[in-house]
């Protein structure tokens, strides 16, 4: 977990693997936690040794009940990217420490989270003005370049956008003290990404002073430590003579699945699978 080029505090993404053993291990190492739901917050606090200040509620579109529960649990740091969220927070958790999630270029990632989260820079002044009007505290900026990012330049571009958002914050009367660089880290490219981030931060935030840097790695922590086993509950053979399927494709092993838009699976057979003809037709 120690990298020379990493200058951020880690907040592990609980959604990636909420196994109690993993959470206890990370908590013991002093890691913070990125939670996206009531259940994830409860799992972390149930460990007994994690102060609520070590949690960021990194979900920009929360149910009112979620915000109310965060307030009761002492979780103050949370993200937003829209006006509706500001109204909800003002009603149910006015003492929250808000982090503005901005939209970045995530086109060079396997999972483009910008399809659902992040405020474009053009919307930032209006959001900050509304936050001021409602008397809310905005402490910083967050972004996410997408899960499975495969181009380090995405981080440099995101830092440049964050700098612009910081300047907009100053113009709106805020002094931001937090920069959350999100996740999207891969083990094979972590050092390269950290180097790009470090250089970009030095360039765009030479006056960073007391700005706190945090990151939200998820699969980076656990992808090599776990495998997910699942049963094959049905099989279907290719239709003979299907013009859309070549002979080579028909003979190649394949898997039919769904609900994988936000997952990056690698399939491997764990045991011998009987030929399709061995299955009863009943």
Q: What is each stretch, according to the model?
A:
Residues 1-5:
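An N-cap/entry alpha-helix motif that binds or orients negatively charged groups
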Residues 8-9, 55, 141, 260-265, ...:
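Short non-domain terminal segments
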